């Protein structure tokens, strides 16, 4: 049985844009249904950025703690991060996000050596203009966040090609809801799987 890790943020966790609860069906759950021959571990946390974040469950430090201290036998690690890098408090440029994702790949290769899993790096969906009207997220994201979200795929795909890893652009399959401009509704999770 193939083992897959999905490592991401609130769109991997399944943040419901309507009421902030967890959606019962996420792209990870749908992937598990579509790939019963795979054992899929879903590790999504709200607010997770590539390098830093609030709390112990965020950034690359969390990845190291969970997947380097005790080695796992994953065949594939899929990482979808970058949306929280666009927060006003961080404002990473797309190129910095791509470099941070490169760090995940490099460090995993050092730790796992010849048992390094394959990587699938997923550029997240675009943040849309509705985020600027949302009562909560308008305080966290800016017009620059919306624009930079559209540039993530180019920077991340270039890095993925340089590192010879798989790449997918989630924005080709799904979009953020018009409710909050950041998170997917169930139908978009189903489309992105």
Language model regions located:
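A short helix->loop->beta-strand "cap" motif at the edges of active sites that frequently abuts
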Residues: 109-118
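Conserved SGNH/GDSL esterase-like catalytic core that processes O-acyl groups on lipids
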Residues: 2-5, 11-103, 113, 147-151, ...
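Substrate-gating cap/lid alpha-helix
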Residues: 128-169
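Short acidic/His/Gly/Ser-rich catalytic and metal-binding motifs that mark active-site loops
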Residues: 86-88, 128-133, 175-177
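Histidine-centered active-site loop/cap adjacent to the catalytic His
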Residues: 31-35, 166, 177-193
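Residue-level recognition of beta-strand->loop/alpha-helix junctions
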Residues: 42-44, 123, 169-171
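Conserved beta-strand segments of alpha/beta enzyme cores
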Residues: 39-41, 118, 164-166
């Amino acid at each position: 049985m193939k083992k897959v890790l999905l490592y991401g943020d609130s769109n991997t966790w399944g943040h419901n844009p309507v009421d902030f609860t967890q959606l019962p069906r996420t792209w990870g759950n749908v992937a598990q249904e579509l790939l019963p021959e795979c054992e899929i571990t879903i590790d999504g946390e709200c607010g997770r950025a590539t390098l830093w974040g609030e709390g112990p469950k965020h950034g690359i430090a969390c990845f190291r703690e969970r997947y380097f201290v005790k080695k796992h036998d994953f065949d594939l690690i899929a990482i979808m991060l970058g949306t929280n890098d666009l927060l006003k408090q961080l404002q990473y440029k797309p190129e910095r996000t791509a470099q941070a994702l490169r760090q995940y790949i490099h460090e995993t290769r050092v730790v796992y050596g010849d048992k390094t899993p394959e990587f699938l790096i997923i550029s997240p969906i675009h943040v849309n203009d509705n985020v600027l009207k949302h009562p909560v997220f308008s305080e966290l994201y800016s017009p620059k966040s919306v624009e930079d979200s559209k540039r993530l795929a180019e920077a991340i795909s270039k890095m993925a090609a340089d590192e010879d890893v798989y790449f997918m652009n989630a924005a080709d399959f799904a979009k953020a809801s018009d409710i909050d401009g950041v998170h997917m509704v169930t139908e978009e999770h189903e489309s992105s799987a």
